[in-house]
């Protein structure tokens, strides 16, 4: 009889392991991976899809199975092990009442160990590491159990719903649980550390998260750097400009840069000249296409949607007074995700961030404060300006080359000035000895 009971104990432990492994596997498996396997013709994946589509019901089935097998294991296992151990303690001349207690303690410990290790921990570990294989193997048996136990599962689920409603709580489906942006960032970081995604993928997805927070004024070409063409300029005069600037599109002004009336595409003008439709003595006014104007504080995601809708590649940004603050191109927006894009004419273009050494950089004055913070792991803040050059000017209004500021353990040095504009700033993280030396010099 005890042999039969031991076999039943082993079966109950195996069933516990089955339900535990099934529970963790169906939670762990990715829906996109299941869809891929179904597309490849994997029939087992269809059963997995059915289970994950009705996740709440099948998780309840797993919980019911674990509970039933655990109760059965406690009732049957402890009494069986206790009966097997009791004669051993009697032979050791342990008093009867004491041998019964010791047998019970040993039986309880053995069953608990087997239940936790063999029935819970080991299956859970396997299911987490091999979620795909486990879910493929166990999906069909789990469906059979669900069908058999459906009345009980239905009763338990509805009883749980009534209980939660009695406390004024709504039942939340497992499928309705969504990750916040911060949670997704943590998952992304962990996936990168574990090697599931590479550095480029990690960088792109992070940039997409940051994309929503970017404003047009943070990525614009400022008014002072806009190369615009007068609306009445001759094509021959335009040729002299485009040989130097080498842009494909130019904003067209009427009077000054505060009155941008449109944009021209050089390809369109040159094609018309080559075909003989116009002469080089004609003005560019007939080639002016509409351009959109938006406030400089517009989010770049909204601006991109508007540019796609209007089918334009350039937008003029206006300040609060209606003047031109700068311009943004589709390329500028895309670069916020994929990084810097350079064409065949950008060979001599200098990178905005040049690394000199460890913690030592030359920064373009137009680099955003947020980028500098991320680069150096510091927390510079200023609500009035967006760029590092602007930040320096708010700290020290009358600046000259080689002027320096120490902030957040870093030294910022004016590397180059272009008129009233900070062109380049050298920044380096200071060691503790350098910080102490600088502090002593300032006190002296």
Swiss-Prot record:
Domain of life: Bacteria
Family matches, as PROSITE patterns: CBS, CNNM
Gene3D superfamilies documented for this protein: 3.30.465.10, CBS-domain (3.10.580.10)
Keyword DNA repair annotated: no
CNNM transmembrane domain span: 1-201
Entry GO CC: plasma membrane
Signal sequence coordinates: none
Membrane topology: Multi-pass membrane protein
Location within or outside the cell: Cell membrane
Keywords assigned by UniProt, alphabetized: CBS domain, Cell membrane, Membrane, Repeat, Transmembrane, Transmembrane helix
Transmembrane segments: 7-27, 61-81, 101-121
Domain CBS: 220-282, 284-344
GO-annotated molecular function: flavin adenine dinucleotide binding
Keyword Isomerase: no
Family: Belongs to the UPF0053 family.
Protein name, per record: UPF0053 protein YhdP
Gene name of the record: yhdP
């Amino acid at each position: 009889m005890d042999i039969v009971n031991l076999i039943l104990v082993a079966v109950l432990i195996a069933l516990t392991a089955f339900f535990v492994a099934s529970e963790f596997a169906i939670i762990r498996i990715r829906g996109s991976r299941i869809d891929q396997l179904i597309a490849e013709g994997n029939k087992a994946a269809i059963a997995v899809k059915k289970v994950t589509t009705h996740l709440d019901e099948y998780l309840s089935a797993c919980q019911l199975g674990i509970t039933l097998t655990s109760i059965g294991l406690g009732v049957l296992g402890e009494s069986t092990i206790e009966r097997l151990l009791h004669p051993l303690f009697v032979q050791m001349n342990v008093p009867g009442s004491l041998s019964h207690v010791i047998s019970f303690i040993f039986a309880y410990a053995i069953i608990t160990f087997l239940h936790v290790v063999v029935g819970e921990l080991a299956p859970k570990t396997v299911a987490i590491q091999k979620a795909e294989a486990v879910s493929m193997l166990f999906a069909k048996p789990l469906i059979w159990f669900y069908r058999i136990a459906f009345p009980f599962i239905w009763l338990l689920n509805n009883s749980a719903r009534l209980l939660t409603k009695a406390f004024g709580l709504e039942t939340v489906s497992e499928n309705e649980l969504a990750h916040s942006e911060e949670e997704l960032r943590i998952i992304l970081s962990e996936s990168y550390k574990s090697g599931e995604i590479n550095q480029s993928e990690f960088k792109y997805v992070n940039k997409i998260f940051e994309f929503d927070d970017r404003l047009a004024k943070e990525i614009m070409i400022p008014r002072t750097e806009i190369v615009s063409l007068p609306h009445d300029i001759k094509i021959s005069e335009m040729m002299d400009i485009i040989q130097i600037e080498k842009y494909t599109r130019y904003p067209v002004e009427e009077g000054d840069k505060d009155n941008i009336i449109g944009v021209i595409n050089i390809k369109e003008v040159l094609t018309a000249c080559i075909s003989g439709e116009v002469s080089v003595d004609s003005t560019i006014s007939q080639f002016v296409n509409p351009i959109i104007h938006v406030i400089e504080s517009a989010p770049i995601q909204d601006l991109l949607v508007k540019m796609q809708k209007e089918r334009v590649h350039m937008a003029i940004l206006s300040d609060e007074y209606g003047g031109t603050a700068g311009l943004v191109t589709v390329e500028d927006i895309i670069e916020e995700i994929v990084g810097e894009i350079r064409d065949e004419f950008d060979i001599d273009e200098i990178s905005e961030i040049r690394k000199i050494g460890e913690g030592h950089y030359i920064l373009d004055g137009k680099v955003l404060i947020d980028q500098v913070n991320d680069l150096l792991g510091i927390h510079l803040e200023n609500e009035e300006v967006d760029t590092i050059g602007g930040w320096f000017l708010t700290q020290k209004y009358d600046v000259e080359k080689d002027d320096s500021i120490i902030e957040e353990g870093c030294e910022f040095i004016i590397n180059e000035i272009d008129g009233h504009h900070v062109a380049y700033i050298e920044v380096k993280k200071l060691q503790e000895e350098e910080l102490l030396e600088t502090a002593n010099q300032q006190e002296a």
